[in-house]
C-alpha cells in the first residue's frame, strides 16, 4: 500500500505479515529520475529534496502550483508530472518486491484519472517485463474501501492485537 497525501509512505505485506527491516519502510524517500518539465523544482523534502515525497506529495503540489492536484484542469502538466513520479515509484516496487498488487491511496490519489495515469506511466517504465511475468500480472489499484481504508485498517490491526492478548 502506498499513501500519497501530506507525505508519501508505503508498506508491504507478505503472507499476512508486514515486511520491514530494522526500521519502517521509507518508500516515499526513493529518488526518481526528474521529469523534463520539472527540472528546476528543488522539492520540498527536508532530507532529500527531490525524493518521491518531495516531488509528488500534497505539500509539493501546493508549493509548485498553489492548488491541490484535483483543482487543476485535466490538461495541466501537473497531472503528467505527478503520475511520472508515482509511476516510477510503482516500477521500483515492482522490480524489488514483485507484488501481486500495488494499492495507491491517500488524498492526492482522489484526483480523478490519476490512478490511470500512474498505471500507464508504470507500464511505460517497467514494461511488460515487470508488469506481466509468466502470466502473473501485477495490478495497480485504488483502495477498495476508498477514503476510509486507513481507518478500517487501523481498527482491524487493533482488533487483531486485542484478540492476541486475550489468547496469551
Segments (PLM) and residue ranges:
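Glycine-rich phosphate-binding loop of actin/hexokinase-like ATP-binding domains
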Residues: 1-55
